[in-house]
Amino acid sequence: VICNLGLDHTEFLGNTLEEIAQAKAGIIKPGCSAVLYRGSPSVEAVFEEACKARGVELCKADFSALVSRSHSFAGQVFDFGSRKALEIPLLGAHQLRNAAVVLTAVGCLIRRGWSISEENIRDGLRDVVWPGRFELLRRNPDVIVDGGHNPQCLEALAQNVRDYLAGRNITALTGVMADKDYTHMYETMA
């Protein structure tokens, strides 16, 4: 499964999304399937080429099949294709896209002969836990922790603040490593 790529760990992976995609494509092995979080055409082309060269099925998450039904601090309800009223406790539109990637991976596994029930799928989504990602620790006052550490994560955090905390006074405490693009990160949060 190839998740959403961002300009992170560039000292190891490369300085462009295409270079990072090339490095990440190294995990694609013959005899397997690859699942891709859809991105820019140039990034997708890197994975398409790697899969073709290795004779690997490439499954791309179809975000157009994703419909958000409701969201609150209790979680989100969404539809994905023919699956309706799926529940996930993770917050934010980006987490729905991540869930779509998971469901795409499950579809690939089922096509490869794995036995995964609808109940297993729903339970897995409903019971997932990701500490430190827009996690509500306490109510009144609300205390939320988010360990995002790159501009892409901060963009998701900023959107979550707009979606879940609109019109409220917010105090933010941040810490960013010196090697991160903290200027862009703070501009995103402003």
Q: Predicted segments — roles?
A:
Residues 2-85, 99, 103-122:
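Acidic, Mg2+-coordinating active-site environments of NTP-dependent enzymes
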Residues 1, 5-6, 19, 82-190:
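Nucleotide phosphate-binding/pyrophosphate-handling subdomain across enzymes
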